[in-house]
């Protein structure tokens, strides 16, 4: 009986005794079968389970949900700000009026950034500049105009210039896009107020203070250099001085645009007319170079300068030599000018006889032409020959004149009847008759 009890005891102790004695081996395997949650919960509280795993267990939902939070402080601390910021954004988005489309877009974009975790990445990328990729970047700066310090000075007019020419030149010099924005940037105040109240995002700058907006686009180094140069140039226009070089140039340009220089141009017209008179002088030197053929130049020169008279009587230079006294030369301009007319008109000679007597025209042509006439006279007297050279003059006059000359008498240049003959002899060398 004792053996049976022992065997039954062994059989009864088998599941309990060995299980209790060998807790390390079989108990973990049998615990899921027999619902040994108590023993497992009592002996193994499972402190390393996360909140989700602890919530899945049926026996330790309360303590397991409360205990894991302090066990993982890092994760809870990281998630707390995002969990607080995201619901606030969602609540603001729901509370917004549907008509505010821009605010809705901004909130939705911010929510997406937080959900994707892109905020830190973008912030890190914006803090670095890539100088080797040569990518263009856009720089924007707003320079405040000191309107509050100098309310009576027209900074906008000084920056824009007459008809906007000043700001156009400034943009060309700096290579930046420059514009004047803010309150007071528009000339029509009523229209500015209307646009400000309209709520158009294009005119949102009207709610800002008056400023100069500078925008540059290019590689990083060039963009910052252009921005610095543009700001330095804009700074010159923010000086409230009406007597500086910039304002003086603008006043001069405004006078040109308003038509003030037109009278000066009208003055320049007569000046050009006077300058048009110089163009005739070029033909005058040409007439001088050509000689007597052009009729206008000689009389002009003879009347004004007197040099053309000398040039006209250059062939009779010996005659000028025979007239040393200056008073005769002074009184000769009118006849000399007429002498130029004599060259134009062969037969009608207007000059006075005294002038030709003083010139002593015989001295110039005595040695050259009268030898031939002496030969003709010694050989024979031809009426036709004397008719050609004397224009129908009597032979007696020629005989007396020739004998007197070659006998060397020269009775004080007595040749009044031979004056037309002198004109004939004068015309003969030119070959006109």
Curated annotation (Swiss-Prot):
Domain KH: start-end pairs: 171-197
Biased amino acid composition, Basic and acidic residues: 424-433
Biased composition (Pro residues): 277-300
GO biological process: G2/M transition of mitotic cell cycle; mRNA processing; negative regulation of DNA-templated transcription; positive regulation of RNA export from nucleus; positive regulation of translational initiation; regulation of alternative mRNA splicing, via spliceosome; regulation of RNA export from nucleus; RNA splicing
PROSITE patterns: KH_TYPE_1
Superkingdom of the source species: Eukaryota
UniProt KW RNA-binding keyword: yes
Record bears the keyword Cell cycle: yes
SMART domains found in the cross-reference section: KH
Key words of the record: Acetylation, Cell cycle, Cytoplasm, Membrane, Methylation, mRNA processing, mRNA splicing, Nucleus, Phosphoprotein, RNA-binding, SH3-binding, Transcription, Transcription regulation
SUPFAM superfamilies: Eukaryotic type KH-domain (KH-domain type I)
Gene Ontology molecular functions: mRNA binding; poly(A) binding; protein tyrosine kinase binding; RNA binding; SH3 domain binding
Function recorded in the entry: Recruited and tyrosine phosphorylated by several receptor systems, for example the T-cell, leptin and insulin receptors. Once phosphorylated, functions as an adapter protein in signal transduction cascades by binding to SH2 and SH3 domain-containing proteins. Role in G2-M progression in the cell cycle. Represses CBP-dependent transcriptional activation apparently by competing with other nuclear factors for binding to CBP. Also acts as a putative regulator of mRNA stability and/or translation rates and mediates mRNA nuclear export.
Domain notes: The KH domain is required for binding to RNA.
Protein name: KH domain-containing, RNA-binding, signal transduction-associated protein 1
Naturally occurring in which organism (per UniProt): Gallus gallus (Chicken)
Gene designation per UniProt: KHDRBS1
């Amino acid at each position: 009986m004792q053996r049976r009890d022992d065997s039954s005891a062994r059989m009864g102790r088998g599941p309990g005794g060995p299980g209790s004695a060998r807790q390390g081996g079989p108990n973990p395997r049998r615990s899921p079968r027999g619902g040994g949650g108590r023993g497992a919960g009592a002996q193994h509280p499972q402190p390393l389970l996360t909140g989700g795993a602890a919530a899945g267990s049926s026996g330790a939902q309360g303590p397991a949900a409360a205990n894991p939070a302090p066990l993982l402080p890092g994760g809870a601390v990281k998630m707390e700000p995002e969990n607080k910021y995201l619901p606030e954004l969602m609540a603001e988005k729901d509370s917004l009026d549907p008509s505010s489309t821009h605010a809705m877009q901004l909130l939705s974009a911010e929510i997406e950034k937080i959900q994707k975790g892109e905020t830190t990445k973008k912030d890190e990328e914006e803090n670095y500049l890539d100088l080797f990729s040569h990518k263009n970047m856009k720089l924007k700066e707003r320079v405040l105009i000191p309107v509050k310090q100098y309310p009576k000075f027209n900074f906008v007019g000084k920056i824009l210039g007459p008809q906007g020419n000043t700001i156009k030149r400034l943009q060309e010099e700096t290579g930046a896009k420059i514009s004047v924005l803010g309150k007071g940037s528009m000339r029509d105040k009523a229209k500015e107020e209307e646009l400000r109240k309209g709520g158009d995002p294009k005119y949102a700058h009207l709610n800002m203070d008056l400023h100069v907006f500078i925008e540059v686009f290019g590689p990083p180094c060039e963009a910052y250099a252009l921005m610095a140069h543009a700001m330095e140039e804009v700074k010159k226009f923010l000086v409230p001085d009406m007597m500086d070089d910039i304002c003086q140039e603008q006043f001069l340009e405004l006078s040109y645009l308003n038509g003030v220089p037109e009278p000066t141009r009208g003055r320049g017209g007569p000046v050009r007319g006077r300058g048009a008179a110089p163009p005739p002088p070029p033909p005058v030197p040409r007439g001088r170079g050509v000689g007597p053929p052009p009729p206008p130049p000689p009389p002009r020169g003879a009347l004004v300068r007197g040099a053309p008279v000398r040039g006209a009587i250059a062939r009779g230079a010996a005659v000028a030599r025979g007239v040393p006294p200056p008073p005769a030369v002074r009184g000769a301009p009118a006849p000399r000018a007429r002498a130029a007319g004599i060259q134009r008109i062969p037969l009608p000679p207007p000059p006075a006889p005294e002038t030709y007597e003083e010139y002593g025209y015989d001295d110039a042509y005595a040695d050259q032409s009268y030898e031939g006439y002496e030969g003709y006279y010694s050989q024979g007297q031809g009426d036709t020959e004397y008719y050609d050279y004397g224009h129908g003059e009597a032979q007696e006059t020629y005989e007396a004149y020739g004998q007197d000359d070659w006998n060397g008498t020269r009775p004080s240049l007595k040749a009044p009847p031979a004056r037309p003959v002198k004109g004939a002899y004068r015309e003969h060398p030119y070959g006109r008759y």
